[in-house]
Amino acid sequence: MTDYKNKLINLLKENNVIKFGKFTLSSGRESDYYVDMKKAITEPEILDCVAHLITNEIEHDNIDKIAGPALGAVPIATATSLISKKPMLMIRKAKKTYGTSKQIEGELLENDDVVIVEDVTTTGGSLLKAINVIEDNGGNIVKAFVIVDREEGAQETFKENNIEFTPLLTISEFKKYL
């Protein structure tokens, strides 16, 4: 059996996804490392590895849909949907102002059990917004997965909101392999 976690760590290292130095994050905060997940989610081998890790965690659960917030999590949700054979949902940051005016692409039915995926979390705030969109539209979040948790509050955010949160890798775990 493939050890997907070690494979993921090696692929992230090989692709220089986690960079160390001085960086300014989108929030304006300074950080001594940067997680370049856009690079990771455009690599088929990384997506395949991530999709297998998530599918292995949910294969015995009664899951109806795999969801991913736009933009970064859509490739993750797509890959996981392909491996798990579960339909996917794409969650927009805001409702469209044209056409069908949807915020969720894909068919979310009342009481669908949904797994949501994300590329990287810091505090978990943006993923929580996507979770609220699903719940406001009748879906039930069963689990939340993230490729890399920066360990800056996401675990606590999800615990406070009674959401099972599983990082495939934490920044502390990654640093051990350097």
Curated annotation (Swiss-Prot):
Reaction(s) this enzyme catalyzes, per UniProt: orotidine 5'-phosphate + diphosphate = orotate + 5-phospho-alpha-D-ribose 1-diphosphate
Highest taxon listed in the record's lineage: Archaea
Family: Belongs to the purine/pyrimidine phosphoribosyltransferase family. PyrE subfamily.
Subunit structure: Homodimer.
Function: Catalyzes the transfer of a ribosyl phosphate group from 5-phosphoribose 1-diphosphate to orotate, leading to the formation of orotidine monophosphate (OMP).
Required co-factors: Mg(2+)
Organism from which the protein derives: Methanosphaera stadtmanae (strain ATCC 43021 / DSM 3091 / JCM 11832 / MCB-3)
Molecular functions per Gene Ontology: magnesium ion binding; orotate phosphoribosyltransferase activity
SUPFAM superfamilies, sorted: PRTase-like
Pathway: Pyrimidine metabolism; UMP biosynthesis via de novo pathway; UMP from orotate: step 1/2
Positions annotated to bind 5-phospho-alpha-D-ribose 1-diphosphate: R92, K93, K96, E118, D119, V120, T121, T122, T123, G124, G125, S126
Catalytic class of the enzyme: transferase
Keywords in alphabetical order: Glycosyltransferase, Magnesium, Pyrimidine biosynthesis, Transferase
Protein EC: 2.4.2.10
InterPro entries: OPRT (IPR023031), Or_phspho_trans_dom (IPR004467), PRibTrfase_dom (IPR000836), PRTase-like (IPR029057)
NCBIfam families, alphabetized: pyrE (TIGR00336)
One matching Pfam family: Pribosyltran
One BP annotation, GO: pyrimidine nucleobase biosynthetic process
Amino acids binding orotate: T122, R150
Name of this protein: Orotate phosphoribosyltransferase
